[in-house]
């Protein structure tokens, strides 16, 4: 029996991914304040570094057992992760936050086809329809104003593509490798790449901008949003298909909306409620035929 067959473990894995999206959704509030003070790539470097150090301290026994195969697979996942975050961050400089959020989550529609391409597993019809419904929901949640295409949109589309690749390869590598080990290596590689790129693009880092309040925000991003969030994603994806995982992870937009309404005072409109309804419908449809077939 494969790791993706047990109902109980699949439910726990799905709950883990939902918790991840709640954490990531709340991170929008923290990021909104942090990016105004710390430049984007240095912010990535700090959050990935905090996560990497914390993971190594907690799971040092697993770190001591890392082999060459782990290094290759985890390192490649780290590259995909860094590239997706890098292009999302710089895409945001040239486009609106709403378009950036929407285009990033187009990985929902890309994952079934990339999973087919890389792993030779053809997506079921209900998975494709569910992904399309999720895109409609994401559009209702994210898009507003000018819908023209600009440089920022293209950069963000690259982000969405690499995040889709990241999801597909997590599915591939966590089948034969420990997901915790994969998470540790991803954080280390993403942190290293961030520290290499940041000085080139943004000059030397000014540590004086980090006060006590900023440190609390950085610790939240590093420990909760990055360490715990990606740990739950990597472990959860071991027991779920990439198609199901991508739709569940896209709920980051739903929880981002909820936290923005609660903490930032953003208005809750009928359009946003409809977007949430489409998202829930996509999840139900993505699993419906599996249940009737069992």
Residue ranges and their predicted role:
Residues 44-46, 100-106, 170-192, 223-262:
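Helix-helix packing/entry segments at the starts of transmembrane helices
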